[in-house]
Design a protein with these regions (language model features):
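Bacterial N-terminal signal peptides that target proteins for export
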Residues: 2-18
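Active-site-proximal cofactor/substrate-binding loop regions of enzyme domains
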Residues: 31-107
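The N-terminal extracellular segments of secreted preproproteins, especially immediately downstream
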Residues: 21, 46-49, 174
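Extracellular/secretory pathway and lumenal proteins
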Residues: 10, 14, 26, 51-54
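C-terminal segment of classical bacterial N-terminal signal peptides
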Residues: 21-30
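Short, conserved sequence motifs used for protein processing/export or organelle targeting and
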Residues: 82-104, 116-256
C-alpha cells in the first residue's frame, strides 16, 4: 500500500523544573539496558499486509537490545475501517522521514531502524541485518539515557556524547506505551481478524533539546499516563520532528 498525505500538527510539550515534591526516589530499571536499536513500525489496522509485520515487531520487542515501537498511521482510514490506535502525528513522522531521504516512500508496513534505514515491515532478515550493522562509533545509539521515578514525576537524564560535533542538535522525546493491544477488526481489508499490536505509542511529547552535552528533565507522570499505558520510552534523536535524523540514544521501562 502507498499513500501521500498532508502535514499534521504535533502536540509536543516541554516540561522541566523541580516541583518541590518530597518522595522516595526509585531508579526505574530499564528493561532494555544499553539498547543498540530503535525500530519504528508504521502500521495500520486497515492494511492487509501489516499483520505479519505486527507479529515480527512483537518478537523484536522481546529482545532486550532492541526498543520496538508501533506507530499506527491514519491515512488508510478512508478504506472502510477507522484505525482505533492511529495518530496523525505518526503519519506526519513517517512523511518527515521520507522528506529527509529525498523520496516519497510512504507505505505500510514500513520499518525505520535507528532513524535512518527504511525497510518493508515484514522483512525480518533485513531488519535484523540493519540492527546488526549499527555502529556506536558513528554516534548512532551511543548516548546513555536513563529514567528515575520520584513520586508522581519521571526524571530523565541524558549523558554527554563523546562523538557529537560542536554543531550537534537534536531533541529528547518521551513516549507513552501500551505493551500489548488486541484489536478485533470489523471492516476493511482485515475484516473479521483479531490482531495484537505491540509496544503501541499512545502519546509522544517533546521534553527538551540536545546539543551534545548532558541534560536533565522532569516530567509529571500524569502527562504520559492514560488508560492502558504500562511502559515508557525516552529517545534522543538528531535533527528535529520535521527533519528527523539518526537515533542517538534511548531507554525503555515498564511503569507497573
Amino acid at each position: 500500500m502507498m499513500a501521500y498525505h498532508s502535514n499534521s500538527r504535533w502536540s509536543g510539550a516541554l516540561v522541566s523544573g523541580a516541583l518541590g515534591v518530597c518522595a522516595i526516589v526509585a531508579i526505574i530499571r530499564p528493561a532494555h539496558a544499553d539498547p543498540r536499536a530503535v525500530v519504528e513500525l508504521f502500521t495500520s489496522q486497515g492494511c492487509s499486509s501489516c499483520p505479519p509485520a505486527d507479529k515480527i515487531l512483537g518478537e523484536l520487542a522481546k529482545d532486550p537490545s532492541v526498543i520496538a515501537l508501533s506507530m499506527p498511521i491514519d491515512y488508510w482510514d478512508y478504506l472502510g475501517w477507522k484505525d482505533t490506535l492511529a495518530d496523525a502525528r505518526f503519519s506526519a513522522r513517517q512523511k518527515a522521514y521520507s522528506h529527509m531521504r529525498g523520496d516519497r516512500d510512504v507505505y505500510t508496513p514500513q520499518v525505520i531502524v535507528n532513524g535512518s534505514v527504511r525497510l518493508i515491515g515484514s522483512d525480518r532478515a533485513g531488519i535484523e541485518g540493519a540492527i546488526g550493522d549499527t555502529k556506536k562509533t558513528d554516534g548512532v545509539m551511543s548516548v546513555p539515557v536513563s529514567m528515575t521515578l520520584a513520586g508522581k514525576q519521571i526524571s530523565v537524564s541524558v549523558a554527554a556524547s563523546s562523538t557529537a560535533s560542536t554543531e550537534a542538535h537534536g531533541e529528547v522525546w518521551i513516549c507513552s506505551i501500551s505493551k500489548t493491544v488486541p484489536i478485533s477488526i470489523g471492516r476493511g481489508e482485515n475484516s473479521g481478524r483479531q490482531v495484537t499490536y505491540y509496544n503501541v505509542v499512545r502519546n509522544l511529547l517533546k521534553i527538551g533539546d540536545w546539543n551534545g552535552s548532558s541534560g536533565n528533565w522532569t516530567i509529571p507522570l500524569e502527562s504520559i499516563s492514560r488508560e492502558g499505558v504500562d511502559a515508557a520510552v525516552v529517545y534522543v534523536q538528531d535533527g528535529n520532528r520535521d527533519k528527523p535524523g539518526a537515533m542517538l540514544g534511548a531507554a525503555y521501562t515498564s511503569l507497573h
